[in-house]
Design a protein with these regions (language model features):
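N-terminal signal peptide c-region/cleavage motif recognized by signal peptidases
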Residues: 12-14
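Short helix-capping/linker turns of helical repeat alpha-solenoids
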Residues: 27, 31, 44-48, 60-62, ...
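Positively charged n-region of N-terminal signal peptides that target proteins for export
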Residues: 1-4
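TPR/TPR-like alpha-solenoid signature
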Residues: 20, 52, 73, 88, ...
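Hydrophobic face of amphipathic alpha-helices that form TPR/SEL1-like repeat modules
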Residues: 20-27, 38, 42, 53-60, ...
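Terminal, low-structured helical/coil segments at or just beyond the last alpha-helical repeat
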Residues: 120-153
Length: 153
């Protein structure tokens, strides 16, 4: 079941935004090092989708050693740039302790942020909420509101 959820959350369909992206072209051919090189250049220029895509390479271990901590860091960078699917994936990573410690407050907060930015993160939100006390829920909502104001969208 967990693998099915991972597939849905981190599906290849949501991996890339532009079909004409040169990195995506290399990725489809299995040329992961070429895709990584292109995305690294774009990420160095602050491109959120490139940052996110690098994170997913590390999440799945495509062309790099699988490293959930590195994946988490890239995902968080993209999430802070306003990329809703990165916000959703970050919420998932907090929920399950993938690349970071389990943190239901952050999971709930990031799912709220993703929802605010148009991503359907309701399932993650509901799963995180089960683990929250009323005080923790209030903290998560405050955190989400603070982050929404800080994120450049």
């Amino acid at each position: 079941m967990r693998n099915l959820i991972l597939l849905v959350i981190f599906s290849t369909v949501s991996l890339f935004t532009l079909a004409d992206d040169k990195g995506f072209t290399h990725y489809k051919k299995g040329e992961y090092s070429k895709a990584l090189k292109i995305w690294t250049e774009e990420a160095d220029n602050g491109e959120a989708n490139a940052i996110y895509n690098i994170g997913l390479l590390y999440f799945f271990g495509n062309g790099v050693n699988k490293d959930l901590s590195i994946a988490y860091n890239y995902c968080k960078r993209a999430a802070l740039k306003g990329l809703a699917r990165a916000q959703n994936n970050l919420a998932y990573m907090y929920l399950n302790g993938m690349g970071t410690n389990k943190d239901y407050v952050n999971s709930y907060a990031w799912s709220l942020i993703a929802i605010k930015h148009g991503y359907n993160s309701q399932g993650i939100k509901d799963n995180a909420k089960i683990h929250l006390t009323p005080a923790m829920l209030t903290d998560a909502e405050r955190l989400a509101n603070k982050m929404i104001k800080e994120i450049k969208k």
